[in-house]
């Protein structure tokens, strides 16, 4: 049974979003090449999806009592409507009512120089947007281009690209803006608190534990190893599997651009689970996994009936298990598969 669980999970976990799986979770590790934050003792705090407002306020209270410093990292998916070059010519446009989705990070500009170069920090203060290299390649972007964006609040903004930097430096987000611009785009959620001081002692942890009532948090200190969850960031997902425009349906379900869907999504009869609708790239690894299940005599542990009713692979929607800031589920690409989602069968994958 353990072999089955481990083998099938390796298919899904590589592409699916877990509770703590958001781009930028390794913020501190990705930015140690810059002068600033590495000169301090650092505590980072995160929780599934978003830091509750109550947790945020309790962190602020703790930091005030300790005399330390804190900044909050924000994140949400916003819409890309069009791209204009330096002469205001449209180099990219979307179909009516459709948008591309950009995973965007926010940071307080007054603390940006602790995590980024002086150049990037100054560009953020000038209200410009920083874009990752993979994202620039995906949409043929150049520094100086203007992005016409639709925020979480449906407000349309036009931002100039200040610089294109490696994805690892941006924390594997697609774009980076200041908190000020983030608020204008409706990005009000925080995914991570970063606390720093010249020396962190046990008093810091006592104060945090005393004040923060919600205990299901992930707390790292100094060189704590990041959570290796194998989740591909959005920029790599798009690089490997392509990108598509989306149209909103009800806040959770979306309509995927028909051209991309017709070229990439297929239905096939599979052993054990029956008919499945997935990204065509998934057939080979999925078939290999299911054949191994059969070879080991474990096919009775998977429920075909439940897969047909409640499981599946391709499901164009946003993640709604927690406040995920409009993140697009890996199911929208047809690269995640759910089996045994409701029954007492083990394992649930």
In which residue ranges do the predicted regions lie?
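Acidic helix-start/capping segments at beta-turn-to-alpha-helix junctions
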Residues: 302-320
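Short, surface-exposed glycine/acidic/tryptophan-bearing loops
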Residues: 315-343
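Alpha-helical transmembrane segments
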Residues: 17-40
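Sec/Tat-exported extracytoplasmic proteins
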Residues: 139, 151, 290-297, 343
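Second-shell loop/turn segments in exported
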Residues: 48, 125-126, 268-280, 325-326, ...
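Active-site acidic/histidine clusters and adjacent loop/turn architecture
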Residues: 236, 240-306
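Sec-dependent N-terminal signal peptides of Gram-positive bacterial secreted proteins and lipoproteins
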Residues: 4-20
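Basic-flanked hydrophobic alpha-helices used for secretion and membrane insertion
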Residues: 36-41, 51-70, 75-223
């Amino acid at each position: 049974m353990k072999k089955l669980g481990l083998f099938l999970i390796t298919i899904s976990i590589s592409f699916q979003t877990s509770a703590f799986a958001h781009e930028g979770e390794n913020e501190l590790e990705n930015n140690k090449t810059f002068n600033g934050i590495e000169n301090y003792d650092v505590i980072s705090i995160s929780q599934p999806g978003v830091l509750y407002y109550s947790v945020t306020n309790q962190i602020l209270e703790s930091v005030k009592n300790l005399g330390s410093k804190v900044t909050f990292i924000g994140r949400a998916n916003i819409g890309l409507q069009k791209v204009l070059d330096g002469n205001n010519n449209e180099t990219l446009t979307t179909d009516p009512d459709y948008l591309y989705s950009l995973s965007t990070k926010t940071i307080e500009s007054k603390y940006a120089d602790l995590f980024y170069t002086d150049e990037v920090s100054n560009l953020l203060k000038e209200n410009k947007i920083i874009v990752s290299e993979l994202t620039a390649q995906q949409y043929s972007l150049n520094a100086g281009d203007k992005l016409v964006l639709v925020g979480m609040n449906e407000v349309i903004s036009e931002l100039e690209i200040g610089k294109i930097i490696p994805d690892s430096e941006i924390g594997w987000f697609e774009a980076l803006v200041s908190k000020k611009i983030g608020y204008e785009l409706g990005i009000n959620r925080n995914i991570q608190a970063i606390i720093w001081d010249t020396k962190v002692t046990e008093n810091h942890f006592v104060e945090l534990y005393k004040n923060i009532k919600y205990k299901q948090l992930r707390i790292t200190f100094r060189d704590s190893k990041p959570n290796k969850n194998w989740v591909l960031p959005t920029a790599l997902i798009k690089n490997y599997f392509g990108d598509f425009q989306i149209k909103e349906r009800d806040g959770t379900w979306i309509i995927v651009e028909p051209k991309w869907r017709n070229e990439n999504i297929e239905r096939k009869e599979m052993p054990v689970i029956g008919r499945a609708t997935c990204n065509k790239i998934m057939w080979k690894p999925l078939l290999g996994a299911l054949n191994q299940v059969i070879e080991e005599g474990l096919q009775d542990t998977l429920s075909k009936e439940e897969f047909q009713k409640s499981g599946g692979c391709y499901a164009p929607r946003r993640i709604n298990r927690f406040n995920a800031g409009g993140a697009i589920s890996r199911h929208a690409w047809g690269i995640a598969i759910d089996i045994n989602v409701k029954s007492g069968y083990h394992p649930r994958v």
